[in-house]
Regions:
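Protein kinase-like catalytic core scaffold
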Residues: 24, 46, 147, 165-168
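Active-site activation/catalytic loop segments of kinase-like enzymes and analogous catalytic loops
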Residues: 181-225, 241-260
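Conserved structural core of kinase catalytic domains
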Residues: 30-65
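Catalytic activation segment of kinase domains across protein kinase-like and atypical kinase folds
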Residues: 156-194
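Structural motif at the C-terminus of the N-lobe alphaC helix and the adjacent alphaC-beta4 loop
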Residues: 11-23, 78
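Conserved HxN/HPN-centered segment at the entrance to the catalytic loop
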Residues: 19-35
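Single conserved hydrophobic/aromatic residue that forms the stacking wall/gate
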Residues: 2-13
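ATP-dependent phospho-/nucleotidyl transfer catalytic cores
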Residues: 54-66, 81-150, 155-163, 241, ...
């Protein structure tokens, strides 16, 4: 994991003759053994150098979404030549086949006796399962690569300077090999939703194309140099994939009796499932428009 500290990204910036590198890369303080982390027997700790005159933002706007797209595309581009064997921080984190396996196991066990209520929803999800598991299948066929991705893309995981310019990507604990769909799709799952992820009124849930266009423009500007034609072609698929995946995860937990996600009320995971599945449907309807816009950027 040390390669993602002050050495790997910093060296890339030096080769690119970047200035102000100390503010554009998180620098981790090494231990006396030379490691960039310390294990106290129970937990891991890291200390990074404070970056002065920096701030995080929470607001998701077309302007901030464009900047996020540029920076995370740049982040992937700088790490594109690193070996995939870097290691998975969370195994199968964004593996759709694995998430479907979890759902099917939950359905078979029906631990909380809730299957009668959700059987029709499970059937709907299963109809699209083969299509939504395409990434893993294409990877096994050698048609789709895995790259080093951040895997937690959001506005608050970047530092900005006092003038609103992007300094660096932060919160690197989920950085690992994945499909580029992880960074592209997961950002738009949250940022492109016009409502909270647990909105009970499904009529309030729509997919925000203005956020999509801004993020896609920034991302493709900085990532198109290394993306394959298939990766670019499948970016709209990524936008569908992540609300679908999250719906599957919420539903599996609901069927299991709410054992994983913290809930605020008895039907919370069920409400979350319906909300994410509605967002998936909205994203699917927007795919032709997404494809047309991405083509215009190339």
């Amino acid at each position: 994991r040390d390669v993602l500290g002050s050495r790997g990204l910093g060296d890339v910036y030096k080769r690119q003759h970047e200035t102000d590198i100390d503010r554009k890369v998180l620098r981790f303080v090494p231990t006396v053994e030379g490691k960039t982390y310390y294990f106290d027997g129970e937990r891991y700790w890291r200390v990074c150098v404070f970056i002065p005159e920096s701030q995080t933002l929470e607001a998701v706007t077309p302007e901030s979404s464009y900047l996020v797209g540029v920076k995370f595309g740049e982040f992937e581009a700088m790490l594109a030549d690193l070996p995939e064997k870097l290691g998975e921080t969370i195994p199968d984190f964004h593996n759709m086949e694995f998430r479907m396996q979890q759902l099917r196991e939950a359905v078979a066990q029906n631990a909380a006796g809730r299957m009668e209520k959700v059987q029709s929803l499970v059937d709907e999800i299963e109809k699209d399962a083969e299509e939504m598991c395409a990434a893993e299948r294409l990877y096994r066929e050698g048609k789709l690569p895995k790259r080093i991705c951040h895997c937690d893309t959001k506005v608050s995981n970047m530092l900005f300077d006092k003038d609103g310019k992007v300094l660096c990507v932060i919160d690197l604990d989920t950085t690992m090999p994945s499909f580029v769909f992880s960074d592209f799709g997961d950002f738009l799952r949250s940022a492109g939703n016009t409502a909270p992820e647990d909105e009970p009124d499904l009529n309030k849930i729509h997919f925000n194309m203005d956020i999509f266009r801004a993020f896609a423009k920034g991302y493709i500007e900085s990532a198109k140099s290394f993306l394959t034609p298939l990766e670019i072609e499948m970016l709209p698929y990524a936008v569908m994939l992540f609300p679908y995946m999250q719906a599957v995860r919420f539903l599996a937990d609901y069927i299991n009796g709410d054992t994983y996600y913290q809930i605020k009320y008895a039907e919370h995971n069920y409400v979350r499932t319906l909300a994410q599945y509605k967002l998936y449907q909205e994203a699917r309807r927007a795919v032709p428009e997404m494809k047309e816009y991405i083509s215009s950027l190339l």
